[in-house]
Amino acid sequence: MRSTLCWITLGLWIVTIVVAGWLFVQGWTTQGTDRRMQIVLAPAERDLILGEMRMLLKAVHGVVTGLAGQNQDANRTQMEQAARSAGMDMAADVNPMLMAKLPLPFKQMGLSIHAEMDALADAIVQNETPQQILQRLSNMTVRCTTCHDLYRFSTEH
């Protein structure tokens, strides 16, 4: 009897781990009508993610605006602050339940963008050339467009 209970417990534990692992990788997704993967979120979660994307875009705009300015030395502080505002600190407080709903490739792309924003801020402080900074931005924004090509958000009904 005791052996059977142990096997049942072990089986349930394994099933739980497999399901949790599958959800961690897949997230809460369905196939969209436009061939993109739909990430299913609550309306407030969707608004939070879209707001974060807008903040990332504003950070890119802040860096590009600084590069376009005449006074590069004065603009470096503005550029560094813009990039740093979208770094890993921005992603630190995301609700773990929300993160669980996101598919693994989406999480990887998003976190890599935040990490590279911090690296961009460091590069600005270290006086990388405008060309080097633009190359970094280009490497980041290609992931943004890839993500938008692959995913879309829908809300729970």
Regions of interest found by a model, annotated:
Residues 1-114, 155-157:
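N-terminal export/targeting leaders of redox proteins
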Residues 62, 119, 143-146:
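Solvent-exposed, charged/polar functional surfaces in cytosolic regulatory/catalytic domains
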Residues 140-152:
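The canonical Cys-X-X-Cys-His
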